[in-house]
């Protein structure tokens, strides 16, 4: 890929419920740009309400690329995102417009801007073997294995995160090298100039209230029925990345009778707040960010001024 630092892209990062979408739509109206979604929940079809997917009016005003691109039963990696995002960026730039990358999935932003390590492709035989071992011995035993071969990854990956735990073991068994060793090598650099913004309220209580209000609004819009439809498909379960999106797991547990309605609401709001906290932690360590206050009247002008 040709390196062309004279061509700009804009990134707009932020925690969930911080006002990213509203600002992005205003930018599309005022600035010659097109939106690329950077969100690991919005990629899924049939998951509209619980992911706060832009509605028909918002999509008409400002079409979003890389949403509704895969089925909830399928997987989609950071490497898949990087490939697809670079293709979308190139297409937008070729038509004389500015790509506007908007979202809160920091792993996707990191993969896009910093590159990825050359990890081995998935091996179904190895994966099946790991799954059998997990069924026989439990994920804790496999986590103990990981701790012996890759203590750094074991510290980062929880025993109750089977997808990432299995992947770390799979990488080692295929390559003979730990995930930590392999991630020291990165793929090619991002070939464009990135003007980077982050939006969040300075008062965390404001964000917490926004999260609570938004989830309760989702419920009135039919979120429970949405999860019921997904559950009724019969090919989805709580171990899939799609069903680990905040809110979906808790609603699924409610529909299974594991928790009552009030507990579901409380757990979903808490899980969303925890997600926002993790996103803010990433952002505080992110270099070269221009910070915006959620709801500030001059946000649009600030972005346009720095992006010219």
From Swiss-Prot:
Enzyme Commission identifier(s): 2.5.1.75
Does the record bear Magnesium in its keywords?
Answer: yes
Main EC class of this protein? transferase
From what superkingdom does this record's organism come?
Answer: Bacteria
GO molecular function terms here? Answer: ATP binding; tRNA dimethylallyltransferase activity
What is any Pfam family matched here? IPPT
Annotated residues that bind substrate are located at: 16-21
Record: residues binding ATP: 14-21
Residues passing through the membrane, by range: none
Cofactor(s) required for function per UniProt:
Mg(2+)
Q: Which reaction does it catalyse?
A: adenosine(37) in tRNA + dimethylallyl diphosphate = N(6)-dimethylallyladenosine(37) in tRNA + diphosphate
Q: Residues annotated as region Interaction with substrate tRNA?
A: 39-42, 163-167, 244-249
Q: Which InterPro entries match?
A: Dimethylallyltransferase (IPR039657), IPT (IPR018022), P-loop_NTPase (IPR027417)
Summarizing the function annotation, the protein's role is: Catalyzes the transfer of a dimethylallyl group onto the adenine at position 37 in tRNAs that read codons beginning with uridine, leading to the formation of N6-(dimethylallyl)adenosine (i(6)A).
Q: What binding partners and quaternary form does the record give?
A: Monomer.
Q: Which family does it belong to?
A: Belongs to the IPP transferase family.
Q: Can you say what this protein is called? A: tRNA dimethylallyltransferase
UniProt lineage: Bacteria, Pseudomonadati, Pseudomonadota, Gammaproteobacteria, Alteromonadales
Its encoding gene is what? miaA
């Amino acid at each position: 890929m040709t390196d062309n630092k004279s061509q700009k892209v804009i990134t707009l990062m932020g925690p969930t419920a911080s006002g990213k979408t509203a600002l992005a739509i205003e930018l599309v109206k005022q600035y010659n740009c097109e939106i690329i979604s950077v969100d690991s929940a919005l990629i899924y079809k049939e998951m509209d309400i619980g992911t706060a997917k832009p509605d028909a009016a918002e999509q008409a005003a400002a079409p979003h690329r890389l949403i509704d691109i895969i089925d909830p039963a399928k997987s989609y990696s950071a490497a898949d995102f990087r490939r697809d995002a670079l293709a979308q960026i190139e297409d937008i730039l070729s038509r004389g417009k500015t790509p506007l990358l908007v979202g809160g999935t920091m792993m996707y932003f990191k993969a896009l801007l910093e590159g990825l390590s050359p990890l081995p492709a998935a091996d179904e035989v190895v994966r099946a073997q790991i799954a059998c071992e997990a069924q026989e011995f439990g994920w804790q035993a496999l986590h103990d294995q990981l701790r012996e071969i890759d203590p750094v990854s074991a510290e980062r990956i929880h025993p109750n995160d089977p997808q990432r735990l299995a992947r770390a073991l799979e990488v080692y068994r295929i390559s003979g090298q730990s995930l930590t060793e392999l991630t020291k090598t990165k793929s090619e650099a991002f070939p464009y100039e990135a003007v980077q913004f982050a939006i969040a309220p300075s008062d965390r209580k404001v964000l917490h209230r926004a999260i609570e209000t938004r989830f309760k609004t989702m419920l009135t819009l039919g979120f429970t029925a949405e999860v019921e439809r997904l559950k009724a498909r019969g090919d989805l379960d709580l171990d899939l990345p799609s069903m680990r999106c905040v809110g979906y797991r808790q609603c699924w547990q409610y529909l299974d009778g594991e928790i009552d309605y009030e507990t579901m609401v409380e757990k979903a709001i808490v899980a969303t707040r925890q997600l926002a906290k993790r996103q803010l932690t990433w952002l505080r360590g992110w270099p070269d960010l221009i910070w915006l206050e959620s709801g500030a009247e001059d946000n649009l002008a600030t972005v346009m001024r720095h992006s010219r």
